[in-house]
Design a protein with these regions (language model features):
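Outer-membrane beta-barrel proteins and related beta-barrel translocases across Gram-negative bacteria
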Residues: 1, 21, 25, 53, ...
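Transmembrane beta-strand segments that form the barrel wall of outer-membrane beta-barrel proteins
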Residues: 1-3, 9, 33-44, 52-54, ...
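Outer-membrane beta-barrel initiation region
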Residues: 1-33
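Membrane-embedded beta-strands that build the outer-membrane beta-barrel scaffold
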Residues: 24, 36-38, 56, 70, ...
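Outer-membrane beta-barrel "beta-signal"
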Residues: 158, 183-195
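Residues that define the transmembrane beta-barrel architecture of outer-membrane proteins
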Residues: 16-20, 48-52, 80-86, 99, ...
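Outer-membrane beta-barrel strand-turn architecture
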Residues: 28-30, 44, 58-64, 94-98, ...
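Detector for outer-membrane/organellar transmembrane beta-barrel domains
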Residues: 73-140
């Protein structure tokens, strides 16, 4: 995900900005209820602030993308944080007529001794205007909170999802309507690849 973090003479808490990440899940049960998880995350401009995490992902109903994730995070460098974490998550991606609806949310806690809570979510509705084009246009809302930083954004969104490729490219304008976390309002370009 690419986003201009901006520069300010009076720095505010940051929540967002350009970042990279990936995740692999390996099913340990045929039902899909228990999986091994391995992922990494880092701010694009501060790789040493990122981490790699390994853990177990439990979904009570294997066909429903909602569950609990227990991880051990290991920092890449001194700017990151090594700790255990517990995350509850859930979401849906469905189509209603010409509308594509995406809802996702997660909340959790990081640290066994020095505990910090976090939460974030997204709600987006996009419409396919032309059956011949794999482009959908709509609007979305994004929210996130962690110690010392919180924000809510709304804005238009456009997504390209080729039918024969597991790739989604989205371009949003995120207008910050609540919170004081950097970066300021602006465009966000996201690239997601799934297998």
């Amino acid at each position: 995900m690419a986003r201009d973090a901006g520069v300010s003479a009076f720095p505010s808490p940051a929540l967002g900005g350009s970042q990279i990440g990936g995740r692999i899940r390996y099913r340990l049960a045929r039902s899909g209820t228990l999986s091994a998880s391995l992922r990494f995350y880092a701010p694009a401009d501060r790789l040493k602030a990122g981490d790699v995490a390994a853990g177990l992902d439990w979904r009570p109903v294997g066909t429903i993308p909602a569950g609990l994730l227990v991880e051990r995070r290991q920092a890449f460098g001194p700017d990151g944080r090594s700790a255990f974490s517990l995350t509850a998550y859930g979401g849906i991606s469905t189509a209603v007529g010409r509308a594509a609806i995406d809802l996702y949310g997660q909340a959790g806690i990081v640290g066994a001794r020095n505990r910090d809570m976090f939460a974030d979510g997204i709600a987006a509705v996009r419409f396919q205007l032309d059956d011949a084009l794999p482009v959908k246009v709509g609007a979305g809302a994004w929210a996130a909170a962690q110690p010392g930083a919180a924000r809510v954004d709304i804005g238009p969104t456009i997504a390209l999802r080729p039918a024969d490729a597991p790739v989604t490219i989205a371009l949003d304008w995120r207008q910050r309507i609540a919170g004081n976390a950097a970066p300021d309002s602006g465009p966000v370009l996201s690239l997601a690849v799934g297998f």
